[in-house]
Every structure is written in structure tokens, then in C-alpha cells.
Amino acid sequence: MIRRVVQKDSTGCGIACAAMLSGTTYRRAKLLAIDLGIASDRPPYYTSSRDLSLLLRKLGLEPSRGRRLSRWESLQCLSVVGINHNDETDTWHWVVYVPTANGGYVLDPKKSIKSARRVDFGRMTPCSCIPVLRPNKSFKPTPLRGPA
């Protein structure tokens, strides 16, 4: 079961999604992201599809290549999904899509979202996704700078 992780920083949604999928804490995922040069100690920082894929791999997951997404119905597998693209800033919000026999649900790391599982797909406009296939069997945790 994947547990929702709430982002601790205003722009930490990608880090929170990586933490959810890997079963680690936000703090541990953020420290790794800082070590990889993806994030900084203080926001704002933004995770691109490439950065997020790297972080997912370093956390022991096997992301496949990111792709554009325009309809939730076309998603069939566990994925990190970019939603609600802002044309002015060229930014989006990362969430985790979990497929089920009933169509799936979204785990949203945004603190103001109170429900653990979102199914209000009409309020979330997908723009891209990174399918996450399966755990990497040869995974060895990356050493961190400090305590996790």
C-alpha cells in the first residue's frame, strides 16, 4: 500500500511523490534530492521530469520515460502525474496516480488537500506522466549526508 506523504515545502511536490512511491520519508527524499543537485535547502526549487526520474531511480524505483498525458482514462499503471500546468510560469504540480479495478485514485502531496485519496479528476488536468514500473531489485540505499 502506498501512503500519502505531504510536501513540507511549497514547491516540494515532486520530492513528496518520490517519497510516497519509495516508502521513505519526505526528509530522506529531500536530502537525497539536495545531494543530487535537484533541490536546495530552501524553496523555491522545481523538479523536472528528468530530475524526478533520477530521484526515483536513486530511491530504488524503475521509472519509464516520461510522456505527455491529456486524459486520465489513458493511464493504466502506477505513475507520477504532472497536473494543472501554468502557462505563465511553465510549472505544474506532481501527484501520484494509483490504478485500481474501479478506475484509480490520486495521492496529492499538497498540504491543503485534506482527503487521502482524490477521485475528483475533473479538477485535475493532467499534462504529463512518468510511469513507475516496479521496484529495482538491485537497489542499495544511497548514503546520505546526515541522519534521515
Region spans (language model):
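Active-site nucleophile-adjacent alpha helix/oxyanion-hole segment immediately C-terminal to the catalytic cysteine
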Residues: 1-43, 54, 58-59, 140-148
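Compact, aliphatic and Gly/Pro-tolerant "microcore" segments centered on a short helix or tight beta-hairpin
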Residues: 126-148
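Conserved active-site-adjacent core of cysteine acyl-enzyme catalytic domains
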Residues: 24, 34-134
